[in-house]
Amino acid sequence: MTKRTSAKHKIDRRMGENIWGRPKSPVNRREYGPGQHGQRRKGKISDFGIQLRAKQKLKGYYGDLTEKQFRRIYAEAERVKGDTGENLIGLLERRLDAVVYRAKFVATVFAARQFVNHKHVRVNGKIVNIPSYRVKEGDVIEVRDRSKQMVALIEATQLAERDVPDYIEADHSKMQATFVRTPALGDVPYPVMMEPNLVVEFYAKN
């Protein structure tokens, strides 16, 4: 098992949910958490625990962001006019690694981060190797010519387990995508329920 595969499986086990909807997730085979005592009946979870879990799940989904990274994004979502939870989702979906993942250029969020880091991606014709780079509406994201024949890339575009959402226009024949608009929570194809409102409650109290 690769380090990246281990990381995403660890997050699924920790959450007890298949948060990316992957067919090989370990939680598809059992309905209890990791560890020796995973099968014990869980007690009632406190409001704090519910809010913390919502935050950890959202952080994990976008590649297990650090608390510092996530808190910075949240602070920006809070400053922007409008609903903080919706703003948070919009900012997360505008990350370059998230757009590369949504466009189905790669199979996982973790692969997207590595793909960007290794300079396989251009934004509006310029190489960008920062996964957290903030994409704007109308930006064109494309795979570099020398990277377009990578086997993993071609396989990812053919994955049937998820579709490209309508706020991204992807042309896999050109390995190119356009970020059409910033999505609302209801537009984002999360395989599990994400509750940014609980994240807002968490940070309001902690």
Curated annotation (Swiss-Prot):
Encoding gene per record: rpsD
Function: One of the primary rRNA binding proteins, it binds directly to 16S rRNA where it nucleates assembly of the body of the 30S subunit.
Subunit (UniProt): Part of the 30S ribosomal subunit. Contacts protein S5. The interaction surface between S4 and S5 is involved in control of translational fidelity.
Keyword Translocase among UniProt keywords: no
Bilayer-spanning residue ranges: none
MF terms (GO), sorted A to Z: rRNA binding; structural constituent of ribosome
HAMAP family attached to this UniProt entry: Ribosomal_uS4_B
Domain S4 RNA-binding, residue spans: 94-154
GO BP terms, alphabetized: ribosomal small subunit biogenesis; translation
Species whose genome carries this gene: Roseobacter denitrificans (strain ATCC 33942 / OCh 114) (Erythrobacter sp. (strain OCh 114))
Sequence similarity: Belongs to the universal ribosomal protein uS4 family.
One GO cellular component term noted in the UniProt record for this chain: small ribosomal subunit
Stretches for region Disordered: 18-46
Keywords: Ribonucleoprotein, Ribosomal protein, RNA-binding, rRNA-binding
Highest taxon of the lineage: Bacteria
The name this protein goes by in its record: Small ribosomal subunit protein uS4
Stored InterPro entries: Ribosomal_uS4, Ribosomal_uS4_bac-type, Ribosomal_uS4_CS, Ribosomal_uS4_N, S4_RNA-bd, S4_RNA-bd_sf
Keyword ATP-binding attached: no
